[in-house]
Amino acid sequence: MKEYLFLFHSTVGVIQTRKALQAAGMTFRVSDIPRDLRGGCGLCIWLTCPPGEEIQWVIPGHTESVFCQQDGGWRCIAHYGISPR
């Protein structure tokens, strides 16, 4: 298991992801974005899952990026733009 940090473009993404994770019984927590990572709406979700499964929780247009901690720092695994409306 590994812990991943999800950043979002807005709080709507946080709420939608939280609801999906709760419904699936996943282990996660919502918190403020760490100071050394700025961006998005100010909230993030920490998700614990096996490597490779984190991608299924990305919500297009809402998820900004996914990070994990590596060698004492942050590693960006993926970055997503905002979908046009």
Kindly give the residue locations of the regions a language model identified:
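Amphipathic, hydrophobic secondary-structure cores in small proteins
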Residues: 2-5, 11-54
